[in-house]
Amino acid sequence: MASWGGEKRGGAGGSPKPAVYATRKTPSVGSQEDQWYLDYPGDQWSLGFSYSWWKNSVGSESKHGEGALDQLQHDVRLEDLGELHRAARSGDVPGVEHVLAPGDTGVDKRDRKKSIQQLVPEYKEKQTPESLPQNNNPAAPSQAEGGEGGVACGTVEQMTWLCSLPHAVGGGDGDHSSTGAVGGHPRGPGEYCHLHEQRVHHHIFARGKRKGKNHVSNVVR
């Protein structure tokens, strides 16, 4: 069993560093309980250990022990643990990023990112056919899937990549060009559509492809 004393911060910043001592006490010959005690004379913090051995102990008081558990305690450097703890909490200890409180997992909920398996259902729920505007441009040229120059919108990743392509011909601003092409897609004479409608068109094609329907893909030049 180990017990920690509460840390007190009332000491002066320029006060000399108090000494740390640790002793091993065995009350009597044949006792099965050894006690380690670590303390500051300045009463800044204290640390106590109590172990039960399944062997007879030597009835004496010493700073060294016999056996594996005693050796483990002896190898621990008894330094200024109070200042080390305060420095770790303030980020002044190399190699220590964060000191966890009891029950703290160290993971910030704001840093957790959703996987693609979680994002796809949410995206499909938001982008329903009823919520998307209609693309009133039946003359949009298309090719069969897998044809030369065709780009298939089969998955969300492909759809995102396709919609992030430069949607400009000539002018480079995504508006109507002199050739009647909008968003990189050629149009017939007098038939125009906006860049937003082009993206909606891609969304509809991608959603239909996931349902297993045979849709043609838009041509990206």
UniProtKB/Swiss-Prot annotation:
Residues 1-10 have a biased composition (Basic and acidic residues). InterPro entries: C144A/B/C (IPR040118). Residues 1-28, 89-151 are annotated as: Disordered. Transmembrane segments: none annotated. Residues 129-140 have a biased composition (Polar residues). Belongs to the CCDC144 family. This is Putative coiled-coil domain-containing protein 144 N-terminal-like. The gene is CCDC144NL.
